[in-house]
UniProtKB/Swiss-Prot annotation:
Protein name: Adenylate kinase
GO CC annotation: cytoplasm; cytosol
Segments of this protein annotated with the region LID: 126-162
Provenance organism: Methanosarcina acetivorans (strain ATCC 35395 / DSM 2834 / JCM 12185 / C2A)
Domain free text: Consists of three domains, a large central CORE domain and two small peripheral domains, NMPbind and LID, which undergo movements during catalysis. The LID domain closes over the site of phosphoryl transfer upon ATP binding. Assembling and dissambling the active center during each catalytic cycle provides an effective means to prevent ATP hydrolysis. Some bacteria have evolved a zinc-coordinating structure that stabilizes the LID domain.
Pathway membership, UniProt: Purine metabolism; AMP biosynthesis via salvage pathway; AMP from ADP: step 1/1
Residues reported to bind ATP: G10, A11, G12, K13, G14, T15, R127, S135, Y136, K198
Binding site for Zn(2+): C130, C132, C149, C152
Listed Gene3D superfamilies: P-loop containing nucleotide triphosphate hydrolases
NCBIfam families, sorted: adk, PRK00279.1-2, PRK00279.1-3, PRK14527.1
Protein family membership: Belongs to the adenylate kinase family.
């Protein structure tokens, strides 16, 4: 069962990916994570990527796709995988399709979590963090005492990129980047869009109902 997971910031994509990993026993593959792992381990492609990263440049698609191909060939991807954060552009989607054909692991389904902007802005701009790693939400999960962490007693704060204006900018970028991919996979007949406004467990049940066809 080979899956691509799309969803804007705040849609709960990370939460659902983790639940899918636990339930199906297939790995979540985040391009950021495997890129950092290759750099850390000093692989040939990792060193090539590092040369660009050190200059503050984007890692070229051909380097990134090589790293992804190697990861998808590992034993834990035998029964499937969840691609998270890739592809980001139509050329990347074409390159991905080419390597998946080569290793005979085509994508079964592209899952797209859809949540209205106003809900996402509310979810993200209400987030509060603590330096100890605890997280809260002004409405759904506030600390017991205003601005004080329940766990360590430290001051909770809002991240600079979690303000309503910053969140809307991130959503605009996401839509501009992702819409062509939504159209790309819709044309291929493998896109399924889900309502991400429901409760976490309800969304997960919806996901499982869709994936039952491929398990």
């Amino acid at each position: 069962m080979n899956i691509i997971l799309f969803g804007p910031p705040g849609a709960g994509k990370g939460t659902q990916a983790k639940k899918l990993v636990d339930f199906y026993g297939i790995p979540q593959i985040s391009t950021g994570d495997i890129l950092r792992a290759n750099v850390r381990e000093g692989t040939e492609l990792g060193l090539a990527a590092k040369a660009y990263m050190d200059k503050g440049e984007l890692v070229p698609d051909q380097v990134l796709i090589g790293i992804i191909k190697n990861r998808l060939n590992e034993a834990d991807c035998e029964k499937g995988f969840i691609l998270d954060g890739y592809p980001r552009t139509v050329p990347q989607a074409d390159a991905l399709e080419a390597i998946l054909d080569e290793i005979e692991k085509p994508i079964d389904v592209v899952l797209n979590l859809e949540v209205p902007d106003e809900v996402l802005v509310g979810r993200i701009s209400g987030r509060l963090m603590c330096k100890c790693g605890a997280s809260y939400h002004i409405i759904s999960n506030p600390p017991k005492k205003d601005n004080v962490c329940d766990i360590c007693g430290g001051e909770v704060f809002q991240r600079a990129d979690d303000t309503a204006e910053a969140v809307q900018n991130r959503l605009d970028v996401y839509k501009k980047q992702t819409q062509p991919l939504i159209n790309y996979y819709k044309e291929k007949g493998i896109l399924v869009t889900l309502d991400g406004t429901k409760e976490i467990d309800v969304v997960f049940e919806d996901l499982k109902a869709i994936l039952a066809k491929f398990a």
